[in-house]
Amino acid sequence: MENMGDSSIGPGHPHLPPGFRFHPTDEELVVHYLKKKADSVPLPVSIIAEIDLYKFDPWELPSKASFGEHEWYFFSPRDRKYPNGVRPNRAATSGYWKATGTDKPIFTCNSHKVGVKKALVFYGGKPPKGIKTDWIMHEYRLTDGNLSTAAKPPDLTTTRKNSLRLDDWVLCRIYKKNSSQRPTMERVLLREDLMEGMLSKSSANSSSTSVLDNNDNNNNNNEEHFFDGMVVSSDKRSLCGQYRMGHEASGSSSFGSFLSSKRFHHTGDLNNDNYNVSFVSMLSEIPQSSGFHANGVMDTTSSLADHGVLRQAFQLPNMNWHS
């Protein structure tokens, strides 16, 4: 049904230099092609075919074009749907063109409005139960202020109002939306720029997240080590402050034996329940016969040395044990 031959070779195919691409802007289409066509002024290049576009289905148009591979340009007249009406007749051979969206005004670089662009979609069948297709048309027409009517005889203008002809020329661009080759070079470049921007943003967010995660991990580790140090230091100070006291000769050996048996048989974590039980049992098994030396120095050097442990005794400052 949709026979799309080699559209780049059509009737009157222009001789263009290798690498030539025809991707005009909306302003260029209206100013340099449509307006000159309406004014009967020679065009920059004969690259747009003249055809009554509504006498064909869209899949028949590529073979009628003078130039184009994935989008095709045509000059076409427009007829009225009803005599003396202003609505255009958009019926085609096996369907119709339906306008979508709102008209887009086209301005020159001097902010002068020169034309209007309308988007249309082709529907197969008859309205209102037509089947939507992927064929799209952009229709460009001149605004009333840019129509050359001064050079035309008055009787021609009157005759035109009484005829079905609505516009002598409009410029139409046709393409199929789902064509994999539809994107032009500008759209490809724009898509690549957008992808690069998204990847860069994603990479930056990933790096920021990684840095924050590392900082959180470092902070957690530092806090864990900090509190571990507090627990260990507190335990050591408790042992030294409470149990490094003077012993009688009879009690020194028992306390040294106690430290030897309890102090060096733990290799687990401070947070382990077994360690907590051992620590409680260690407190309960401390000899009660221990005393205080007159100078506040724990006299366990000899007993600890017997068990292979040597701890340097220290004095507690500002403590008067004789008061």
Swiss-Prot record:
Residues 114-183 bind DNA. It is found in: Nucleus. One of its GO terms (molecular function) is sequence-specific DNA binding. Residues 201-221 have a biased composition (Low complexity). GO terms for biological process: embryo development ending in seed dormancy; plant-type cell wall modification involved in multidimensional cell growth; positive regulation of gene expression. Residues 201-223 are annotated as: Disordered. Residues 16-177 form the NAC domain. Gene3D superfamilies: NAC domain. Keywords: DNA-binding, Nucleus, Transcription, Transcription regulation. InterPro entries: NAC-dom, NAC_dom_sf. One of its GO terms (cellular component) is nucleus. Expressed specifically in the tapetum. Its main location: nucleus. It comes from the Eukaryota. Transcription factor of the NAC family. May be associated with anther development and pollen production. Required for normal seed development and morphology. Plants silencing NAC025 produce abnormally shaped seeds. The NAC domain includes a DNA-binding domain and a dimerization domain. This is NAC transcription factor 25. It comes from Arabidopsis thaliana.
